[in-house]
Amino acid sequence: MKKYLSILSAVAVAAAMVACEKDGNDDANKVDVNDPSTVQTEHLVAYFPLESEAKAVELGKDITFSKKGGSAAFVEGVRGKAYANSAADCKVFSYLDFKLGANNPFKTMSSFTMSAWVKSPVPNDGSPAMLSINAGDGGMGSLLVMYEGWGCNTDSLYVKSYLFNTRTEWKGQDLGLSNVAFTTDKWFHLVYSYNEATSMMTLYSNGQFVAESGRWAGPEVNGKQEGLGKLILDPAMSNLYIGAWWNNLDGTHADAWRSSYPGSVDEIRFWDIALTPEEIEDLYTKEVTKADKL
């Protein structure tokens, strides 16, 4: 009987140990509900934490960090480190270069959302590019987020978003404006989206809607005008740059007004869908929760 009880006790102890170990693993594997990457995770296709050269990109099929150029540096950001033009000068070359392979996710995005923390002074020269993807239009590229230097004010930046749809007659599309929601010298969370179902380009700041514009595939024909619809970016794309115009770096359109981004960028994410206003607000809440410094 004692032997039988001893066996039962040993079994009970072993079971308890397994249960504890399992509980511990469950805790370790629990999803952090406050992580911004939990917003539409299945559609999150690229994530650039911009912590260092080794951890500039964390998620993104066929996206690899290539090099840091000019006055590019990794400095204190909203969450950990961030990319910055250490000279804070549009006239000083500064960029990060990422190579885009044949299977990169930007080639197949028919809709998209891009989010990033940005902080910049008023541009002191030209119109700087915060993010650019090459190919597409020879001047503007496939996808672009820039500031129009002439449209910025002391308290607000002129943010301009651009895309190039290869499948439509009217290919180059943009949405840009100056707004106090795009603050100077202060971090704000910028979201740029395109929705193929509505043909709308939209800009948000700190989780709130700022502006939108319906885009068209071509001119009106017989009283009807087709929306831009499904997006197909140029499959010839090969590079994504943070902080500089792609054509300044490859020399194809090295115009003087295409200046370097003078500020900082952190936590860039791309989804292959247009997030809803509610999801964008939720994303901002999670971003703030995870922020080290704002």
Please give the residue ranges for each predicted region.
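Extracytoplasmic low-complexity segments
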Residues: 4-6, 17-91, 236, 281-294
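Extracellular, beta-strand-rich glycan-interacting domains
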Residues: 46-53, 113-122, 237, 256-287
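Glycan-recognition/cleft segments
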Residues: 131-165, 223
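Short, aromatic/His-centered strand-loop micro-motif at the edge of beta-sheets
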Residues: 162-189
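Short tryptophan-centered beta-strand motifs in secreted/extracellular beta-sheet-rich domains
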Residues: 185-194, 203
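Flexible glycan-contacting loops in extracellular carbohydrate-active proteins
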Residues: 214-263
